Amino acid sequence: ELSAITQYINNENRISCGDCSLAKTLIGIAMAEMMHLQKLGELIVLLGGNIDYTAKYRDGRKKMWTPECLNIPAQVKSMLLADIESEKAAINQYEAHMKMIKDDCVNRVLARIIKDEEYHIILLRALMK
C-alpha cells in the first residue's frame, strides 16, 4: 500500500492540470490506498505485531521499502498500465495472505481491500479510454 500511495501521488503530481479529472481520480485512489495502509497497520498492532515497512523474504532476509519499489513511467498510458499491474499484484498478494491467515475478521478486511483494488482497476481502465 505504501508503494501504491507513493506511485499514485507521483503520477498525479506529474500530470496535474488544475481541473484534470485524471489527476483527481489518481489522488482519490491514493487516498483509498492510505486507508488500506492505516487499516492494515491497525490490524498488525491489534494482533501484536510491529510495523516496520520491510519486505520479508522466505529465507528470513528483510529489505526496507524504498522508492526503488515503484514503477514510474513517463507516458500517461504507461503510468496507467503500471498502476493496473500494481493493483493486480496487490490482489494476488492479498489472496495469498488470505489462504495463510485463518482469522475470519482479518480475512474480511483483506476481502474488502481486494474489492477496492478491483474497483481501482475499473477506474484506471476507464481513464485509458
Provide a role label for each language-model segment:
Residues 2-129:
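Non-heme di-metal
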